[in-house]
Amino acid sequence: MAGKGVGTPLSALFLLVLLVVTIGMMEVQVAEGRMCKTPSAKFKGYCVSSTNCKNVCRTEGFPTGSCDFHITSRKCYCYKPCP
């Protein structure tokens, strides 16, 4: 019977730690959030290099950018966290 008294607090502690870790992971996912996509206003031509696209997007005030397909061509799109 003494073993049952010791196991219960340890099980409760384990579940509490598991809950805290799970909640912590959920907060990180929410903090990352969605990224909003906007066509670059300054990038000209067919987008081949995402590095060039990213650099142009940074001059437009966006943290990043990449070449993405748009219908039949590749265009430069800039990304920022959605409000």
Swiss-Prot record:
PANTHER family: DEFENSIN-LIKE PROTEIN 1, DEFENSIN-LIKE PROTEIN CAL1. Its main location: secreted. Belongs to the DEFL family. It comes from Pinus sylvestris (Scotch pine). GO terms for biological process: defense response to fungus; killing of cells of another organism. Keywords: Antimicrobial, Defensin, Disulfide bond, Fungicide, Secreted, Signal. It comes from the Eukaryota. It is found in: Secreted. It holds the Pfam family Gamma-thionin. Disulfide bonds join 36-82, 47-67, 53-76, 57-78. This is Defensin-2. Residues 1-33 form the signal peptide. One of its GO terms (cellular component) is extracellular region. Plant defense peptide. Has antifungal activity.
